[in-house]
A protein has these predicted regions:
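Non-catalytic, solvent-exposed segments at the cell envelope interface
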Residues: 2-378
Length: 378
């Protein structure tokens, strides 16, 4: 069974960035121009990030700029990282975090001690020319070797073997997550984007909901999700429940949840195109305000100008040029609730991305996969 979704041709604390200058249901088919503006391969932050390209200056600029939080990944990690490949491509680590701080506590995120884990992880590779992108989802239950990390309080954590992938974030925050991904892939992450549960939910509500079609019922009492087969417009609460459910459909695995997440990301991007946020100033501002409050970025993207420039560079990516796959894994013989990376097949993916090449189909063939493929579509 293929793990690929249906292909389509010390650490510093996050800081609030003040004003600064830039350094360095069935729907009508969206017009091509709108689709180009909408299709960013930035997972949870995608809809919010792209609307920043339309923000103005004055009060709006200062307000949105003041919302942003950033982490200086370069300073935190220093030397010893993979070499940056100057071939026109970009690699972005996108995390959905489940901290229980603030509003997220009501949404069931993180642990009771207030710590956080990366509930969702996607490596986004934007090819040279910014006309195509590949997204590789990393299962949170993957057992990996985590490098030594230093947390935000300056405490050192030794390297660990056979730990869950998502523990890197809870151990040392954003920089430890980046360091772990770079150790796993041998690819330098050019940027980092993180969005929390509360921000994701409000983003969907500000957008007016996201239409999806389910081919069979999805019921999960744990996440209070109950969808009949058919077409639904999901508000933020139900959208969040959908992308988090493990027990509502299929085998209850993280791999099935990833399939649902990937399908929802595509539906979300299509909805951004459909509603035409650029023609509605109030909706544009509301989305931008929500997005800038919800995201944490690397310091290079820590201003509205920088984030808008970054988003603007992705406007040429069409839906037929966005490919989403899952990192090749196999079930752990010692624990069926955990997976192990298929190193040889995964290396084909990492090598392809390092060389700015398409991911070969052989890399995701005959690997472990969930049972939710095709259950949800936009």
């Amino acid at each position: 069974v293929s793990a690929e979704s249906t292909p389509e041709p010390g650490i510093t604390e996050p800081v609030t960035t003040g004003p600064q200058h830039r350094g360095g249901g069935r729907r009508r088919k969206a017009a091509p121009g709108k689709r180009r503006k909408a299709l960013l391969a930035t997972a949870w932050a995608a809809a919010g990030v792209i609307v920043l390209a339309g923000t103005g200056f004055g009060y709006v600029y200062f307000k949105l700029n003041g919302n942003l939080k950033s982490v200086d990944i370069n300073q935190a990690l220093g030397d010893g990282r993979p070499t940056k490949v100057d071939n026109g491509s970009e690699n972005i680590l996108v995390l959905g975090s489940d901290t229980r701080a603030g509003t997220n506590r009501k949404l069931g995120g993180g642990t009771d001690d207030g710590s956080a884990r990366s509930d969702t992880a996607m490596i986004v590779h934007v090819y040279k020319g910014h006309k195509r992108a590949s997204v590789v989802s990393v299962p949170r239950d993957t057992l990996i070797d985590r490098p030594a990390c230093t947390d935000a309080k300056g405490a050192s954590h030794p390297a660990a073997t056979g730990v869950m992938f998502n523990s890197a974030y809870s151990t040392g925050g954003a920089a430890c997550a980046v360091k772990t991904v770079e150790s796993l892939t041998g690819i330098r992450m050019d940027h980092y984007l993180e969005v929390d549960f509360a921000g994701f939910q409000k983003l969907i509500d500000d957008l007016g909901g996201v239409p999806v079609t389910t081919t069979r019922p999805i019921s999960d009492p744990q996440s209070h999700l109950n969808l009949k087969a058919g077409t639904h417009t999901l508000d933020g609460e139900r959208a969040l429940a959908l992308v988090r459910t493990r027990h509502g459909v299929g085998d209850g695995s993280d791999l099935g949840r990833i399939q649902l997440q990937q399908a929802f990301v595509k539906a979300l991007l299509d909805q951004v195109a459909h509603v035409g946020v650029f023609s509605d100033p109030k909706r544009l501002y509301d989305l931008a305000d929500t997005a800038t409050k919800a995201v944490t970025t690397d310091s290079d993207l820590g201003s509205v100008n920088a984030l808008a420039d970054f988003a603007g560079g992705l406007k040429g990516i069409g839906s037929s040029h966005l490919r989403m796959v899952t990192m090749p894994v196999r079930y752990d013989p010692a624990d069926p609730n955990r997976v192990l990376m298929e190193k040889a097949k995964a290396e084909r993916i990492w090598q392809a991305l390092r060389n700015d090449r398409p991911i070969p189909a052989s890399a995701t063939k005959d690997t472990a996969a969930g049972e939710a493929a095709g259950v949800v579509s936009g």
